[in-house]
Amino acid sequence: MRRLLFAVTVVLLAAAVAGAGEPPKGHLVLIGGGDKPDAAMRKFVELAGGPGAPIAVLPTASSSKKTGPNQKKQFEKEFGCTDVTVVPIKERAQSFDEGFVKTLAGARGIFFSGGDQALIIRAMRGTPAGDAVATAFAAGAVVGGTSAGTACQSPLMITGNGNFKVIEANNVELWEGLGFFTGVIVDPHFVARQRQNRLISVILEHPDLLGVGVDEDTAVWVKPDRTFEVIGASNVIVVDAAATTVRRAPAAGGGELIGGRDLKVHVLLAGERFDLASRTVMPAASETR
């Protein structure tokens, strides 16, 4: 199967260059699809600066014209936001629009709607609009997303193409993502859509990265100190292959099976926290009071 994967060495080099400067000051609030947890959306608005803060909605991943206006309406009606702008980027050429770029650069909260994550990357990566989001995030803006708007946030992004009934090498199509959620590969709808096969396949081939599977109705709140907290109704799964012995064997009908010994998996619930730098579970906020 053809894999549209940028060289991993390029991704790691880019991450190293980014890491050489000051780390981003922004937070991430990333939802795994399904219903958007009220607590997660309120946290997004709070981190943006409150209901009066400028918020930009990017419906780029969606094929529906209603997605952007509906998300704007939710921010206004449910969370009292008064300065919400839909930035309707659908084509790459629109990412060069000066008005759109100015709106994104001035936003304190930027929210990516769901749909097809490949559309976000095609339209925005390496453009003035994409750069404006990155600059705003580095300066302290909160970036949020749901479903595809979550999947696009890691340095490598699962596109959704592949045979997910097996755990095999070279089986999952990856693209370079936006790279705001560093050190991981994030996968939404994780428990609801039984996506463990594809995330395990990817992490066994990229043990330097953590797999973070975010279930529906659930979010991760990623902080500038490289920790995250679980918000919502279900689970967040962390897959860690740093100490795993990876094995390979021929697969029936071609291909290559991939296996691992001592693969570490954490199943986290609401309120539990994780340190991405040390790859360890932290006490829940309620346990430290």
Regions found by a protein language model. Give the residues of each.
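Bacterial N-terminal signal peptides
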Residues: 7-16
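C-terminal and late-domain segments of enzyme folds
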Residues: 21-51, 62-69, 75-79, 157-159, ...
